Amino acid sequence: MIVSPCDAPKTPVKRLRSALLASSALVCLFSAGQLWAFSLDDVAAKAKEMAGQKFEAPRSNLPNELRDMKFADYQKIRFRDDKAEWAGDKTPFKVSFYHQGMHFDTPVKINEVTATSVDEIKYDASRFDFGGLNIDPKTSEKLGYAGFRVLYPINKDDKQDEIMTMLGASYFRVIGKGQVYGLSARGMAIDTASPSGEEFPRFKEFWIEKPGPDDNHLVIFALLDSPRATGAYQLTLRPGTNTLVDVKSRMFLRDKVNKLGVAPLTSMFLFGANQPSRVPNYRRELHDSSGLSIQAANGEWLWRPLNNPKHLSISSFSVENPRGFGLLQRGRDFSQYEDLDDRYDKRPSAWIEPKGDWGKGTVELVEIPTADETNDNIVAFWKPETLKAPGEEMAFDYRLHWTMQENSIHSPDLGWVKQTQRSIGDVRQSNLIRQPDGSLAFLVDFVGPVLAALPEDKTIRSQVTTDDNVELVENNLRYNPVTKGYRLTLRVKVKDAGKATEMRAYLLREIPAEPGKEPALLVADKADEKKAAAKEAAAKEAAKPAVAKESANDQVEIAKADAPKPEAAKPEAGKADASKADAAKGDVAKADAAKADDVAKGKDGKDIQQPATEAAPTHPEPAKTLQVMTETWSYQLPSDE
């Protein structure tokens, strides 16, 4: 017979009876805790159930006096710090709330989760100071909270600072120590930049686990709803110098979507060094993020500087199981921004680190025209290649890094782009005066420990590709003693300003070849070997003039990419290794062609061997190969620039 510890019979043995009673109390307490255990599975069950039901649009409960208020008036509504959730408890985390107002017209349900219960945190008007606004108390009786903030002593032990905000749709922003709010993350994006219009899912309910006195993390669950999708999320917030958010997401479709955005990031780019302001401005740069960074599964890195285009621009980068991607703010010098109010130099980068197998898909970058910095015009997200049928679960887990230490994200084995500068191209005349020549100049600074360890290495060269919409008139690589890196200067002449132009560049280094071994980043996939062989043969045909040009001008070869298809130039980060291998093999082909120049021609056209003194040495130089030294700079010059 199996006896439940909660109903254990009495025993005449006193010590045994005491032991059983103690065991009974522990097991019953554990059972009670298990009864109230709350997890992502509970939220996922709700999301799955909703996905099988018709979408119910949220209804606004705002009175006109709150709905029609201006932003300046909305800001007057202050939350009372002494009324924060857990204000009297010994926990490092506190939670305060946003009042409804303006377009934040629909309340969200917020619950507190403890070891024994799940309870709704009810709206309480006494938690707010309305700043002299004439708000009728009766009109606010049935209101709710629009969202919430998380407070934590991240900068000083005796001061609670706001480190996370959840307000509007599925947006949330996070900062680390010494940072100020910048770009946002979202739970989900649907049909971003589609002709049919974007759908904005919203978090409709939250569950916040009450932390203990010594807890250094906060767990938040969220239920997402939208006309064509639902979702369940677990966000574990870990404050620090680099604040982390571990995200577990479970998504369900209600209906077909054209484009599902996973781990979306939203930012702002008005102007910067690569696209200067069209009107005079004391701020040289004004943006929350300066570029998109991607790390492919094969270890290659790609950097895409952002633009504020005149027309909507969408770029797709094919990557299978990416190691990471994000919108980064490269450049932390105050002198780059000169803004004492908005401190763009302290705005964090956001880096997405996928967990598990994400499969095939693309990282998509959307750049939207904007006239001022109040509009978020940059979106980046992961778009899965295939989606599951409505009602079936899709799981995407990832870690979100909010950091100002971008160098710690990047691989130390490769250099990266510190900055991209753009200016009018010019040529120095015989009188030493620089004269514009109708070209555009791009100066790309590559830096990093791997480059700093090789100062003025003459074996480092650039590999540049462009589409057919530009003429590349200069490709010059110089050592930069200030950054201990290399500066690549490109001058281009655009053929059709009405078309966007694609350019790519990275640095290579000539190293001795190891028998039977090639640098990993220069080895093409087996499927591409035939294509590489064909390109090598073509390179041999063109090698003589190319080598002669390089020798005369002391410049590296300028490679041209195939013309883009009519739709758009869509870079594919996942295929870049093969192209790098082709480029390296092409250089080997040039060497072969150069050797052919040692064979002279007679008057009758027959080959004449050179004298024996000109023959190849008995001990030829060791074979050389090329090693990729930097990430790939991938730049799009927008149309009508």
Swiss-Prot record:
Instruction: Cite the residue spans of the region called Disordered.
Output: 535-554, 561-625
By its UniProt entry, which InterPro entries does this protein fall under? Gal_mutarotase_sf_dom, GH-type_carb-bd, Glucan_biosyn_MdoG/MdoD, Glucan_biosyn_MdoG_C, Ig-like_fold, Ig_E-set, MdoG_OpgG
Q: Where in the cell is it found?
A: Periplasm
Q: Which Gene3D superfamilies match?
A: 2.70.98.10, Immunoglobulins
Q: Pathway, per UniProt?
A: Glycan metabolism; osmoregulated periplasmic glucan (OPG) biosynthesis
Query: By its UniProt entry, which Pfam families does this protein fall under?
Result: MdoG
Q: Which family does it belong to?
A: Belongs to the OpgD/OpgG family.
Kindly provide the name given to this protein in its UniProt entry.
Glucans biosynthesis protein G
Q: What is the lineage of its organism?
A: Bacteria, Pseudomonadati, Pseudomonadota, Gammaproteobacteria, Pseudomonadales
